[in-house]
Amino acid sequence: MRLSELTHPNQLHGLSIAELEDVARQIRERHLEVVSTSGGHLGPGLGVVELTLALYQTLDLDHDRVVWDVGHQAYPHKLITGRYGDFNTLRQQGGVAGYLKRCESSFDHFGAGHASTSISAALGMAVARERRGESFKCVAVIGDGALTGGIALEAINHAGHMPNTPFLVVLNDNDMSISPPVGALSTHLNRMRHSAPVQFISDSVEERVKSLPFMGGELPAELDLLKGSMRRLSVPKVGAVFEELGFTYMGPIDGHDIERMVRTFETAHKVGGPVLVHVVTTKGKGYPYAEADQVGYHAQSAFDLSTGKALPSKGKKPPSYSKVFGETLIKLCQQDSTVVGITAAMATGTGLDLLQKAVPEQYIDVGIAEQHAVTLAAGMACEGLKPVLAIYSTFLQRAFDQLIHDVGIQNLPVTFVMDRAGIVGADGPTHQGQYDISYFRAIPNFTVMAPKDEAELQRMLVTCLQHQGPAALRIPRGSGEGVPLLDEGWKPLAIGRGEVLCEGDDLLIVAYGVMVPAAMITAQLLQEAGIKATVINARFLRPLDQALIHPLARRIGSVVTMEEGALAGGFGAAVVESLSDQDVLVPTFRIGIPDQLVDHASPQQSREALGLTPTQMSERIQEHFCLNSKPSLVGQEAPQALST
């Protein structure tokens, strides 16, 4: 069958193993063709091609439910659920999303982007099924990395206490860190244990013992213990863990052997309770460069298929904020042995991979465990260490309670570096870092800041480490401004002090973080229109520099705030509240992300859709304040933005 003719996963039913293997080959070819051109997640999807086909061979996706954890491995799923023709629009504005979205396809049964949610969601579907008296199958597919997440373990614990609820978890183990060898012994034990005769004998013996008059219908504790011990003898050590939690364990099996997986899934569907099928796959399967470097090819920008090398970018770019942070932290760690970098399975994305190589003894990776990472850092701070937790803005929101309960309330000196703060682009609404300003504003004791460029980032990192309390620093995705950097000798900033970058008497612009350079360009455009603006680099969200902002706002009389974050409870709201509390009642226009989601597109396209480019902001400001006439208190509606 030609992949282009596959518009419904049920078309896989009845295909021979050879035909399924040919479909797998076509999926890999299309996957590589598109990702090498447009960029995206590469290794995860290549590793689950056979798993996807084998699983869907045993399901009716018009009725059954499959929840893919995270969703970055679901490109094969998309290719066989009616999106083959549009797959070349992957992660592009208006095109196929890089993750699963319920609004994109009826076969995307649950949306995601963050790890470890699949088991809870699929179990919830199974609970709803049981309550309605229906009979569709519910499956969660989760990777071994995501299984380290607390919510996944909580869901397994819950499912194990529902012995009569049919429910399947497929563990996609592509690391082999928790797997024993896949071999004949495992195959034999698995086949024997789950064969019909063994199941019959086991059930029959138990029923016969319970029927004895003197047993009272109960299995003696000694016999129950013996039965459990005998069961564990036939299960690999990792499987015994799941068996103890109430699951029937099958595996490990070869995740690229379609025939064997089909047989195993068919058997699993017949079990009347929770089942975990342990499948061992190779991340990047079928593309040698991705198999050899599974971390580097997890996700890729556009690359040359023949060499595996990224296509050269247009012009030389300044180093990214992440790289500047990582290199600066290395030097600070070398100067102070109490400084420790912490990541939650995102070392490469945050720049901490540099620290891992340079000063490994001052580096910790806790896995996908954001809540644990925050409280671990709090405990370290109690004992005199200076933990620096580098984490994506969107992932830190998973640990909001820990920020308040374990760090904020106790006023502990923990530094949080929120990478990918603001608009991130093609990963879409699950990954936009638009909420950290709002949620950090609400936590007492925190000092919160954002740099205007990479040099100010260096000074802010030093400021955080010298501060005797919790501090948070937000940095954007992508390259810096190209300003000169110091190799050492960074001076800390005065807490809560902003700076004036240019002066004018017609308008006051107060900008935060990545919006400061854009504010300066906007001020130049306004000056060309005859409007002279004062621009403040706020630097700090908490505490806000009221001594600088209030007198200028009172004198100039018109204020604009700029932020790359949610307007609801954001930086602009902080400025407005501060002015209002001190009876500085001046017209204020807030520019930022309105109350909506930001869909997948390039960062530039997202900013254009949100009205956040300098040209657009200049025009919006002039419209709002009616050029040079008396400012209006009534703002114009923000431009229509990308939303889901």
Swiss-Prot record:
Q: How is the cofactor bound?
A: Binds 1 Mg(2+) ion per subunit.
Name the cofactor(s) required for activity, per the record: Mg(2+); thiamine diphosphate
Q: Name one GO cellular component term.
A: cytosol
Classification via Gene3D superfamilies: 3.40.50.920, 3.40.50.970
Pathway noted in the entry: Metabolic intermediate biosynthesis; 1-deoxy-D-xylulose 5-phosphate biosynthesis; 1-deoxy-D-xylulose 5-phosphate from D-glyceraldehyde 3-phosphate and pyruvate: step 1/1
The GO terms describing molecular function are:
1-deoxy-D-xylulose-5-phosphate synthase activity; magnesium ion binding; thiamine pyrophosphate binding
Task: Enumerate the SUPFAM superfamilies for this protein.
Answer: Thiamin diphosphate-binding fold (THDP-binding), TK C-terminal domain-like
The chain's coiled-coil residues are none
The reactions it catalyses are: D-glyceraldehyde 3-phosphate + pyruvate + H(+) = 1-deoxy-D-xylulose 5-phosphate + CO2
Task: Report whether Magnesium shows up as a keyword of the record.
Answer: yes
Provide the E.C. number(s) assigned to this enzyme: 2.2.1.7
- Listed GO biological process terms: 1-deoxy-D-xylulose 5-phosphate biosynthetic process; isopentenyl diphosphate biosynthetic process, methylerythritol 4-phosphate pathway; terpenoid biosynthetic process; thiamine biosynthetic process
Which residues of the sequence carry a binding annotation for thiamine diphosphate? H72, G113, H114, A115, G145, A146, N174, Y287, E370
Q: Which Pfam families match?
A: DXP_synthase_N, Transket_pyr, Transketolase_C
Q: Which InterPro entries match?
A: Dxylulose-5-P_synthase (IPR005477), THDP-binding (IPR029061), Transketo_C/PFOR_II (IPR009014), Transketolase-like_Pyr-bd (IPR005475), Transketolase_BS (IPR020826), Transketolase_C (IPR033248), Transketolase_CS (IPR049557)
Primary enzyme class: transferase
Residues annotated as binding Mg(2+): D144, N174
Keyword terms: Isoprene biosynthesis, Magnesium, Metal-binding, Thiamine biosynthesis, Thiamine pyrophosphate, Transferase
Q: To which protein family does this belong?
A: Belongs to the transketolase family. DXPS subfamily.
- Show the PANTHER family listed in the entry: 1-D-DEOXYXYLULOSE 5-PHOSPHATE SYNTHASE-RELATED, 1-DEOXY-D-XYLULOSE-5-PHOSPHATE SYNTHASE, CHLOROPLASTIC
What is the annotated role of this protein in its UniProt record?
Catalyzes the acyloin condensation reaction between C atoms 2 and 3 of pyruvate and glyceraldehyde 3-phosphate to yield 1-deoxy-D-xylulose-5-phosphate (DXP).
Assembly behavior: Homodimer.
What protein is this chain from?
1-deoxy-D-xylulose-5-phosphate synthase
Q: Which organism is it from?
A: Prochlorococcus marinus (strain MIT 9313)
